[in-house]
Amino acid sequence: MPKIVVVGAVAGGATCASQIRRLDKESDIIIFEKDRDMSFANCALPYVIGEVVEDRKYALVYTPEKFYDRKQITVKTYHEVIAINDERQTVTVLNRKTNEQFEESYDKLILSPGASANSLGFESDITFTLRNLEDTDAIDQFIKANQVDKVLVIGAGYVSLEVLENLYERGLHPTLIHRSDKINKLMDADMNQPILDELDKREIPYRLNEEIDAINGNEITFKSGKVEHYDMIIEGVGTHPNSKLIESSNIKLDRKGFIPVNDKFETNVPNIYAIGDIATSHYRHVDLPASVPLAWGAHRAASIVAEQIAGNDTIEFKGFLGNNIVKFFDYTFASVGVKPNELKQFDYKMVEVTQGAHANYYPGNSPLHLRVYYDTSNRQILRAAAVGKEGADKRIDVLSMAMMNQLTVDELTEFEVAYAPPYSHPKDLINMIGYKAK
């Protein structure tokens, strides 16, 4: 009976173990998770803080006990894999409660340790990061115990924006700072103006090109020279892959600490797979490497690895498109394809349309800005982005399907988009992009 060891019990690891059990009722499967919780909804965490998700239990999908009862898979929380001996096929595990170490053998090893939040490194009792349910509970408890009012949010990526919105909706007074003037880097820079407009509309303070110089209790000194007082600080300054456990092994890492994998999510070492935030693969529609630490990729990788281990080696990963979306107050920001800073590697043209998300005469209409970049050599779509109060998700998903099938920008004229006055136009924005490209 083969023994399968999984490192990490959140989206990638728990899903992969579950899929293996669905296909294989006999294997011995054990998951090691270094933190308190398994199988929680990462994407729900800002909304738990904002009390949009009113009960945190809805963010916790499984407990180890429930997981074992339903799937006969052992999950050990507070157990951190700290080393891998791929020649002996063992892992070294640290019990974080007792500080004891032991070795566990494996026939197949699945690495899904995820990523950790970066920190600016200041010693402060009021500073928090948000990466898991423990962090969420700590933030919520601190707010309640200390009657928090003023919160400094550092960073302007998706998580920071979602946290800021939810703090505001909870009735607190957040302020946003970011070390550069480039916010929400997955979007085109000039399409991010609605973020600043939404902040201005609600009189939420923000400062770009600003950084913290020192923290002394509740007194924050900024590099601009300003000194302000805050009850709480939440850092959203990016993440890094949890790859320290790899250093003892023969597994190759790239210069950023990610594990390169093939189309079966195999590493360079036999019997070891890597999925989720730690793995790097490639785009589907262009020949470029891609690291896309989002939920869809982790779940897709989990399914493919499960099939491989169960004996079906015909299924391979075809690549990422990087489809992503975020809500910020009244606006939705969505994009798909290569990142803005990767476009320079192509000879491309851009075409864009701004018009109502639905028929102009139907009430509640608002502008939707849609932009498409295409390769001039073959006219295939490289990237698309959309911003608006409604309809951005629909258009980006349609364009994602077009890119998946390597359609040209000209073929967008042929798309028969569902039309009724509350939803779109007889010639939708998708069609108009195709006509304008001609």
Swiss-Prot record:
Catalytic residues of the enzyme: C43
EC number: 1.8.1.14
Catalytic reaction list: NADP(+) + 2 CoA = CoA-disulfide + NADPH + H(+)
UniProt keyword annotation of Transferase present: no
Residues annotated to bind FAD: 8-33, 267-277, 419
The entry's keywords: FAD, Flavoprotein, NADP, Oxidoreductase, Redox-active center
Residues noted as binding substrate in the record, renumbered to the chain: T15, Q19, R22, S39, N42, K71, H299, K427
Cofactor: FAD
Highest taxon listed in the record's lineage: Bacteria
Molecular function as annotated in GO: CoA-disulfide reductase (NADPH) activity; flavin adenine dinucleotide binding; NADP binding; protein disulfide isomerase activity
InterPro entries: CoA_disulphide_reductase (IPR017758), CoA_disulphide_reductase_staph (IPR023536), FAD-bd_OxRdtase (IPR050260), FAD/NAD-bd_sf (IPR036188), FAD/NAD-binding_dom (IPR023753), FAD/NAD-linked_Rdtase_dimer_sf (IPR016156), Pyr_nucl-diS_OxRdtase_dimer (IPR004099)
UniProt binding sites for NADP(+): 151-166
Entry's cofactor comment: Binds 1 FAD per subunit.
Domain remark in the UniProt entry: Contains 2 FAD binding domains and a single NADPH binding domain.
Record note on quaternary structure: Homodimer.
Note, other: Reduction of disulfides occurs by a thiol-disulfide exchange reaction, but involves only a single catalytic cysteine residue that forms a stable mixed disulfide with CoA during catalysis.
Task of the protein: Catalyzes specifically the NADPH-dependent reduction of coenzyme A disulfide.
Family in the record: Belongs to the class-III pyridine nucleotide-disulfide oxidoreductase family.
Name the UniProt record assigns to this protein: Coenzyme A disulfide reductase
